Amino acid sequence: GIASLYSNTTGTHNTASGTSSLYSNTTGIQNTASGAFSLFSNTIGYDNTASGTSSLRFNTEGNNNTASGVSSLQSNTTGNNNTASGAHSLYSNTTGNDNTASGFYSLRFNTEGNNNTASGTHSLYSNSTGNNNTASGASSLYSNTTGNNNTAIGHYAFFSGDSFSNSTALGYNTVISASNQVRLGNNAVTSIGGQVSWTTLSDARFKTENAAKVPGIDFIKKLRPVTYYVNHEAMNRYLEVPKGEDVQNRSSLEAKNTYKPNYTKTLESGFMAQEVEKAAKELGYEFNGVDAPKNEKDYYGLRYGQFVIPLVKAVQELNEKLEQKDAENAQLRAKLLELEKRIAKLEKNASN
C-alpha cells in the first residue's frame, strides 16, 4: 500500500498491507500490519499484528500485541502482550499490559490497566486503570474504572460500580453494591440450591476466641418475626439497576435491553435487618448475622445461618433453668416425702 513501511531501515520480517501501514517502523521486526494506518507509529516494536484501519496506530515500542478490528488498540504506545478483537476494542490503551478484549468497544477506555479479560460488546467498557478483572457478557462490568480483581459473567452483570474490588457477579443483571461481595443472580431469582448444604470455615486451628459472651434468650426475645413481600421495583430503583433505555442513553451504540423480569410475588417470613441490628446493639452484641450497608448505595441483609448460635445459647440457657427447676423440684419432693412420713408417724402415735 502507499507509504507502507515508509521509514523502515533495518527492520526485518515485517509485512505491511494498506496505506501508511507500518509507516514509521525503523528497526522493529516481525510485525504484520493490514489496513490503512495500522501500526503507523511503530518504530522498534516487534511481534505485533494489526488488522483493520488504524489498528495499533500509535504503537511505538509495544511488543507482542494483536489487534483485529477498526481502531482496535489504536492508542497503544508501549503496552505489551495485549489482544484486541473487535472495532474500538482496547482503543485507549497506552501502557497497559496483558489485556484481552473480545467484542465491539470492549475495554474501550482502558489506558494503564493490566491483566484484564473482556468478552462481549461493551464489556469492561469504562475500565481505565483497573487490574485483574474478568468480564464475560455484553456490558458486563460496564462502569468499572479503577476496581481490581472483579469477575462478572452475564449480560449487564456488575453493570454499576466504578471502584469496587474483589467482587463477583454471576448472572444476568446481577448487582454488586460494595467490594468483597459475591452475588448470584438478580432479584427476580426465586431459587438457588444444590445437592448439599453450604459449608462455612470453622476450623479451631484458625480461630482465636474472644471474651465476649453470646447472648441467648435475651437476644431472641427481642426479635420480631414477620411475613412480608419484597418490593422488587423499589429495590431496582434504589440500586439503579439499568434498563435498556438507561444504557441506550449512556451510549448510542449500546444495544437496547428488551428483557422484562417476571417477578413472582411470594409471601416470605423473616426479620427486619434494622430491628435485628438494634436488638444486638442494645445488648452490646457484635452480631455478624447482620450484613450492614458498606456505602450509601448498598443495602441491608441477614445471614440467617448465624442465628443458630444465639438460638443454641438460648436453648442452653433454658435447659440450665429447666435443670435447676428439676433439682429444686427433686428437693421439694424429698422434703414432701419426709413430711408425709412424719405425718404418718404422728397419726400412728395419736391412734395409740
Q: What kind of feature is each model-predicted range?
A:
Residues K222-P225, A273-E286:
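Glycine-rich, acidic and aromatic/proline-enriched surface loops and short helix-turn segments
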Residues S140, N144-G216, K221-L223:
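Small/polar residue-rich beta-strand/coil "junction" motifs that cap repeat-based extracellular fibers
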Residues S4, T15-S17, T32-S34, T49-S51, ...:
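Extended alpha-helical scaffolds used as interaction platforms
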